[in-house]
């Protein structure tokens, strides 16, 4: 059962306080401990999981200060970051689904799943999840890295993009790589996936080998793109990200070439 409840003050665990895709990080980290320690008694909370044997609670509220982007804890423990991402996405889902998009009546939270229900027209809404592909591309002992327009700060990463309607994951990889870098790839293989709450993506990761073409990056998407020798890389994404894993997996392949 996924029932909201009013906090009495005796509850203990991790506290995700979120509003408009931002999260409360007092002292720069997720609050942990008794509800009274964080003055949360009387708030309405929803249990959304467990971490290290402790409940994870979601409270949808804007705090006076220390409301920041979830990106601030990307490099923290992967499991905890994933739960925090779930909390932020659920908070935004419930905030944006207060009324039915079909009939305009008030929505109600399901107690058996993450969903909103309309008791008037019986419509049911679920959190939106956007499928994305991300791919590490190797050319001998080099890896293709790009600086994205939305990655200001000098970080270089692998290519990625959203899957379009009626498109397979494999087709999406081939299309995105061609659109963003003008090269063709081969030997495409699936690696892993990672929920990515910016804002509500599911990243599906692949590795591929270079086939043909010269890099010509799309200036609408990328600031630059180039081949980098595996032991002379620029600033890359932090640990616990699927992009970092693809880069590290490609480095291993380069060393074994």
Swiss-Prot record:
Residues 127-251 form the Nudix hydrolase domain. A divalent metal cation 3 binds at residues 176, 180, 221. Belongs to the Nudix hydrolase family. NudC subfamily. GO terms for biological process: NAD catabolic process; NADH metabolic process; NADP catabolic process. The lineage of its organism: Bacteria, Pseudomonadati, Pseudomonadota, Gammaproteobacteria, Enterobacterales. It catalyses: a 5'-end NAD(+)-phospho-ribonucleoside in mRNA + H2O = a 5'-end phospho-adenosine-phospho-ribonucleoside in mRNA + beta-nicotinamide D-ribonucleotide + 2 H(+); NAD(+) + H2O = beta-nicotinamide D-ribonucleotide + AMP + 2 H(+); NADH + H2O = reduced beta-nicotinamide D-ribonucleotide + AMP + 2 H(+). It comes from the Bacteria. GO terms for cellular component: cytosol. Its cofactor is Mg(2+); Mn(2+); Zn(2+). PROSITE patterns: NUDIX (PS51462), NUDIX_BOX (PS00893). A divalent metal cation 2 binds at residue 176. The gene is nudC. Homodimer. It comes from Photorhabdus laumondii subsp. laumondii (strain DSM 15139 / CIP 105565 / TT01) (Photorhabdus luminescens subsp. laumondii). Pfam families: NUDIX (PF00293), Zn_ribbon_NUD (PF09297). This is NAD-capped RNA hydrolase NudC.
